[in-house]
Amino acid sequence: MKLLRVGNKGNEKPGVLDKDGKIRDISSHVKDLNPDHLNFETISKLQSADLSSLPELSASDRIGSCITKPGKFVAIGLNYSDHAAETGADVPSEPIVFMKATSCIVGPNDDVEIVSGSKKLDWEVELGIIIGKETKHISESQAQDHILGYCLVNDISEREWQIEKMGQWVKGKSHDTYGPIGPYLVTKDEIADINNLKMNLDVNGKRMQTGNTSTMIFNVDIIVSYLSKFMSLQAGDIITTGTPPGVGMGMKPQQFLKAGDTMKLSIENLGEQNSKVVAL
């Protein structure tokens, strides 16, 4: 299933794409796509429902984030060896873990803010994992039992704040609008091979990133198992899994976003985002 949220910010309705590509209002079955409802039981009920009988939502309305109010937004850094190389970093022997503030989450086509004085705003197309039930101290072979689905993420990063301001990466990763997710939460049964999905990102119509999830250093099962050793994961938690090469920081000379720039990104079977950078 492809689940999404449609409507003005703060008033989104949960929906699902039916077999004809129409968006059906599922609010009679689930109040919202939040941690209270993002679980395997809810998905099972929706899969058995007669979607064609549900009201249709307008495809021209704003698409919100595919999840609202997740408990955690966990991120994995330098998870593609060629991306690590372009940043001058060593290939990690274990997953590099950091957090993004959940308040940074916005819809897939919402504006991305650039604040006064920001000089190194960067892009990162990434695969997001959505957890479907409590996950604690599990093996890699158990990981798929805990994964509800996947989504497209743009891990927007202000590199000066991330690297030059001292401390952890979270400062450069967490400003409002630095976490566009969606358009869809795609349940895992719709993905034939999560470890072989094409991904790309364009800035102002120019291709910047081209990659495939097959080149991740740590695949989704490893990541979920690894994180579960250090923190419990709950239904609705998002894990974004790292980016392929082609970020602005890795270019020579470096290139960063400015007000008026546009980003278009996609991952195979997970949909597409279109964002504009606006001055705050």
List where the protein language model places each region.
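Structural signature of FAD isoalloxazine-binding scaffolds in flavoprotein oxidoreductases
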Residues: 91-108, 123, 258-269
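N-terminal non-catalytic cap/leader segment that marks the start of a structured domain
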Residues: 1-95, 264
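Short catalytic-site patches enriched in acidic/histidine residues
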Residues: 96-114, 135-136, 177-184, 244-248
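Generic beta-strand structural signal
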Residues: 71-74, 94-96, 110-112, 119-127, ...
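Short, structured patches in soluble enzyme cores that scaffold and shape functional sites
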Residues: 100-102, 109, 116, 123-127, ...
